[in-house]
Regions:
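Structural preference for solvent-exposed beta-strand-turn elements
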Residues: 622-630, 634-644, 648-660, 664-668
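Universal eukaryotic N-terminal targeting presequences
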Residues: 1, 669-670
Length: 670
């Protein structure tokens, strides 16, 4: 829904021609994201942007007191899209806390699962969600002049993807009717199958654990995976040149379009896909094994690689508030004062964070979002890093570091070479992603396409290494461990849309503090306490408008393209709290009406009547259709047997367990 409100002289902006335009919720993403803007239509520019989220999630609250071994099962439920990334990161965290190193084969299987997740998620988002922003129908409604030019523009790589003109590419992206749109849906099915082969279930893995995996590794398993992978590799040989043609055309058709979604190059990548020959998950060695990841960790500031050291990256994490619905934790307990290497840990580090929710009415000039504001301290400033939607930061950091060289992939210092082998219908192909001039909307989307090919190439390497282990008889996939009474752990990886870290403190064998920090808090963060805007806000405000529609018919396509280029996933935005049991000892989210609070300490009709007798009316018990005899209506369907929930009262029922006593509809044991 979009609302437009002409602003009067009392707006305080100094410009009476500004128009407020709001998109809440944003469609074709995951979760509850609202974008509130002020637009100057005379100068075709977005003047101000606020990014909001209206639902609180607080896994950090109800993780307290849990068995640490349950952490990956719980945190995978943070998201229904990339839950496996959370499960993986949680297992990394537990591996460090328990001091366990998984067998090599187990880690190769994890890598194969994560690579399949990258292929699946990037494909379905790029082609079936983001692609709609560039399809023929959308362009005809927002930029008919651009579509007319596309009809007469030959696609430079027609021989590779089969589409003669740019307009043909746009038509192929039309939802449900477009040829490429439908093909991508079929491909996404195969990639999910690849994931399930390795980790049992998508998106919440059933065979992934600290210490390794429960997957039984066989030659047949790897063959089933590789059969699907090679079809995906062939698909990539069509997809990469097709998107290059499409995105290059927008630069040509709309001079100045590089300014859309442009922000200062502040990119964070925590690295992903471990090399088990080097990774032991010990904090003291994290710098070394972090640099051996198949996606290199790194912070890129103004195009320069600041660090690839995971220890430095970890110590630089700061969680800011400012415009968020939380109270500060200044003065509360410090869980970790020094890391295992003796380095001081800041109070605003996730290890020391306390989550103190404070619900209130949205005020765009003060508090307006449930998202916190993660920042990275470089020694001078708390930088509002973004992930470039995930792939842009991953490729940029990996390219600059120049550490990856496995044949299928090579980082050169200024680019990443992706070497795809011969497939059924096409010969070997080499793609090269070059560091772009800008960190903007189109380059985030372009990088997403290239990273799909990157993940496929990496998976080929992982499959080969896994087969080496199996053929050598090293088929162990899991290592035993013990949970310590006291301990800390941190895990770093890349969720599909960017940086992901989990931070855990164990006391008395239970979780004392747990904070997951996924990519969307970084990207969707509101303005922090230092007045620094979050990446969505920063990328949108100040950008030009190229849409041809007038104010009354304005769709905001350029704004939507910018926001979606980050691959928003709002379930990941911050650490959902149901209420806690009264004796649990944990704080629950305050509710305007405590008696309607989800997960109240007491449940059921009797409890409801006790709490609010003036509002409670007993309800007749409902019968489930087709479930046994129905009084006054004759027997149920043939062969159907009576089913009834047993209650504690049955044990003292003189009529026998098969003959239920009539109970009042409001009885406590109903």
């Amino acid at each position: 829904m979009t609302s437009t409100i002409p602003m009067g002289s009392g707006s305080g902006t100094g410009n009476n021609n500004l128009v407020e335009m709001n998109w809440d919720p944003i469609t074709r993403i995951v979760g509850s994201l609202g974008i509130y803007t002020k637009i100057d239509f005379e100068n075709n520019q977005v003047v101000e942007c606020k990014s909001t989220s209206s639902i609180f999630r607080g896994y950090s609250l109800f993780m307290k007191g849990k068995d640490p071994r349950d952490a990956h099962f719980i945190t995978s439920r943070i998201c229904g899209i990339c839950g496996d990334n959370h499960a993986t990161c949680s297992c990394y965290t537990q591996n460090m806390a328990y001091g366990v190193k998984p067998p090599n084969l187990g880690e190769w299987i994890v890598n194969l699962g994560e690579a399949a997740e990258y292929m699946f998620d990037h494909n379905i988002f790029q082609e079936n969600l983001v692609g709609v922003d560039y399809c023929e129908k959308m362009v005809s409604e927002t930029n008919p002049g651009v579509l007319a030019k596309a009809e007469n523009t030959r696609a430079p790589h027609e021989a590779d993807h089969g589409y003669r003109t740019i307009a043909d590419i746009m038509r192929s992206l039309n939802p449900f009717t477009g040829e490429f749109y439908r093909e991508a849906l079929q491909v996404s099915r195969a990639t999910r199958e690849m994931f399930c082969l390795m980790e049992g279930r998508h998106v919440h893995p059933s065979t992934l654990y600290p210490g390794g995996v429960g997957t039984v590794a066989t030659i047949q398993l790897m063959t089933d995976y590789l059969t699907r992978l090679m079809r995906y590799v062939e698909f990539m040989k069509k997809v990469v040149p097709m998107h290059d043609d499409l995105f290059d055309f927008f630069y040509e058709a709309l001079p100045g379009y590089e300014q859309v979604g442009l922000r200062r190059t502040l990119l964070g990548c925590w690295g992903s896909l471990q090399d088990p020959d080097y990774c032991n998950f010990e904090y003291k060695d994290m710098t070394e094994w972090g640099r051996k990841m198949f996606v290199t960790p790194g912070v890129v500031v103004d195009g320069k690689l600041v660090t690839t050291d995971l220890v430095r990256i970890n110590l630089g994490l700061r969680i800011m508030l400012g415009s968020s619905y939380y109270e500060d934790w200044e003065g509360q307990e410090m869980f970790v004062t020094h890391d295992p290497l003796g380095n001081p840990v800041d109070r605003r580090h996730p290890w020391n964070q306390h989550t103190n929710p404070r619900p209130q009415k949205r005020d765009l000039s003060d508090k307006y979002s449930w998202v916190m504001s993660p920042r990275w301290f470089d020694g001078q400033d708390n930088l509002a890093l973004d992930t470039g939607g995930g792939p842009l930061a991953r490729l940029w950091a990996t390219a600059l570091a120049g550490l990856v060289d496995i044949g299928y992939l090579k980082a050169t210092g200024s680019s990443v070479q992706i070497n795809l082998p011969k497939t059924a219908l096409k010969g070997p192909v080499t793609f090269e992603w070059n560091i772009p001039q800008w960190s903007n909307t189109l380059e985030r989307n372009r990088a997403r396409t290239y990273f799909q090919a990157y993940a496929a190439a990496a998976a080929l390497h992982f499959a080969e290494k896994a087969l080496e282990e199996i053929r050598a008889g090293r088929t162990k996939t899991w290592e035993t461990f013990e949970v310590p009474d006291e301990g800390i752990g941190c895990g770093f990886t890349e969720a599909v849309r960017g940086v992901l870290s989990h931070h855990m403190v164990i006391r008395d064998g239970k979780i004392a503090n747990y904070h997951p920090y996924p990519p969307t808090p970084w990207n969707a963060s509101p303005t922090d306490s230092n007045g620094v805007a979050g990446p969505y806000e920063d990328a949108v405000q100040g950008q030009p408008i190229f849409e041809e529609n007038d104010r009354e018919h304005f769709k905001g396509i350029d704004i939507m393209r910018t926001v979606r280029s980050f691959d928003p996933c709002l379930p990941l935005r911050c650490p959902h709290v149901p209420g806690q049991r009264a004796d649990a000892g944990h704080a629950a989210l305050p509710h305007p009406d405590p008696d309607r609070r989800v997960g109240h300490a007491r449940r059921g009709p009797a409890a409801a009547a006790e709490r609010r007798p003036d509002r409670y009316t007993p309800r007749r018990p409902r019968r489930r259709r087709g479930r046994g005899p129905r009084p006054g209506r004759g027997p149920g369907p043939p062969g159907d047997r009576p089913l009834r929930r047993r209650t504690p009262a049955d044990h003292g029922n003189p009529a026998g367990p098969g003959k239920a006593r009539r109970r009042h509809a409001g009885s406590a044991d109903r």
